[in-house]
C-alpha cells in the first residue's frame, strides 16, 4: 500500500480547486462571497454537506447554495483545511472558525480551535472563552478554561467579562475546592460584584449562590458582622436551604493551603546517585516536599517565579552519559509548572538555545538574558536577549546587551531590568528597547548573587578577577545611583560554602551549603549542612534561622534556589 497515495490525491484536488477545474458547486456565504469547490470534498469532510447533497432535497440538485451565518474568512479556512488538512489560527479568527466548524459538524477543526484557545488563555479572555465553550457544549474547552479561571481567580474577577456570567456558570466556578483564594471573603466579594451589575434580575439568585458557594465557617467573624442587612437576609435564607451542615467544618480552598517554600533545583538525592531531585522546604513547619523534576533531567536552567506565582524554567542542558564531557549541548526548552498536577507543561521553545540564562519578569513579559553555549571554537557567552509574550504565546528577539554575559545576575525594579557581572552594570528599558550602563560595584566580581530589597539591589559574594572567592555585600540605591558597602557575610572558607540569595517572607535570606571534613580513626568523613540566614538591614547582620534535615539530598556547586507558594497536598512529602 502506497502511503503517499492519499497525499498525492489531496494535492491534486487542491490544485484543481485553486484553478477552478471540475468544480461542481458554488457556496455563497455572508456578504455575497462565493467559493467554487467540489461536492465530494465537502461531503467527505462534513456531515452537514453530505446530508445536503444526498438527501434528495432542492439543494442536492442546485449548482449554487447559500449558507447564512458563515463568514467568508471562516469558509475559506474550512475549505483550505478540506483540501490540505491544515488551518492557520489567530486570536481574530479562532472563535468564528469554531462556530463555522460547529455548523458544518467538523469536530477535528473544533478541537484544533479549542486547543488554540486553551494555549492562549489569560486573565482577560478566560471568562469569554468559558462562556463560549459553555454555549457550544465543548467539554474540554469548558473544563480547561474553568480550571484557568479558578487558578487566576483574583485577577479574573476584576475583568468586565466576569459580570456577564450566568448564575449557573458562576456557581460552577465558585463551588470548587480548587479555587485559588487565600481568604473566603474574596469569594463573597466576587459574588457581590457580580450581583451589583444587574441587581434587580440577580437578587433572587443570591440565597442559592450563597448556599452553594460560600463556606461561611472559613470567614472571619468580624467580616460577617459587617455584611449589610440586605445581604445578611440572603445569607440567612441560604443557611436554611443548605441546612446545619453549612455551619460545620468546611474543606479549605486550594489557595488557603498554599505555603511559601524554598525550592532547590539541581539537587541530587542521597540514595540515587546523581539522579536529580527538587526538594521544597517549608521553613515554618519544618516539612520537606519534592517537586516534579524538570523534564529531560535539564540542568542549569533559567528559573523564574512570576508575580502570579507561576514557575518557569528555560534553556539548560541534558546531562551527558560521559562523566568527562563538559561541552554540554545547550537546549531551548521552555516549561511552566502546573501546581495542581505537579507536572511541567511544555511552552513555545526559546529562539536561541542557552545554558545558565537569567529569566526576568518585567512589564507583563518575560525576558531570557544571556547565558552560554558550546559551539564552534568552544565556549561562548551570549549577548542575545529574547522576550516572551504570554498573550501571543511566542518569543521574540529584542535588543542585545552591549556585552556578552554568563554567570551574571538579572533583577527587575519599577519596569526596568538590571544586569550585573563583574565590572559591568547594565539597565534595560523595555518600553524603549534600550540598554545603558550604570556605575559598577565597588568590588567587581562574577558569580555573585543579586536581589531587590527595599528599593536597593543587594549584590553578595562572588569571585574576583584573581579567582579568589569573597563574601562582600554591597547595596545599590536605585534612586541615588550609589553603591554602599555592607558588612561581609561571616563565612568560614574552610567549609567550602556555596550561597544562594532569596527573598523569603519579604526578607533577604542566604541559603548556605557547607561542607565539613572530619577524621575518625584515620578515616576522612565528609558531611554537608544546609542552613538559612536572615538579613537584618537595621543591624546590618546575618542570623541563622534554620538548618535543613541532614542527608536528604546533596546540593552540588550549581544548585539554584527559588521561592514560590506551593500546595502541600499536590506535592510528594519527604519529611
Swiss-Prot record:
Report the Gene3D superfamilies cross-referenced here.
Answer: 1.25.40.420, Kelch-type beta propeller (2.120.10.80), Potassium Channel Kv1.1, Chain A (3.30.710.10)
Q: Spans of the Kelch repeats? A: 310-364, 365-415, 417-455, 457-506, 516-562
**Which UniProt key words apply to this protein?**
Cytoplasm, Cytoskeleton, Golgi apparatus, Kelch repeat, Repeat, Translation regulation, Ubl conjugation pathway
Q: Where in the cell is it found?
A: Cytoplasm, Cytoskeleton, Spindle; Golgi apparatus
Q: Where is the BTB domain?
A: 23-91
Q: Which GO MF terms are attached to this record? A: ubiquitin-like ligase-substrate adaptor activity
> Quaternary arrangement and interactors, per the entry?
Component of the BCR(KBTBD8) E3 ubiquitin ligase complex, at least composed of CUL3, KBTBD8 and RBX1.
Which family does the entry's similarity section mention? Belongs to the KBTBD8 family.
What is this protein identified as?
A: Kelch repeat and BTB domain-containing protein 8
Name of the gene encoding the protein in the UniProt record: Kbtbd8
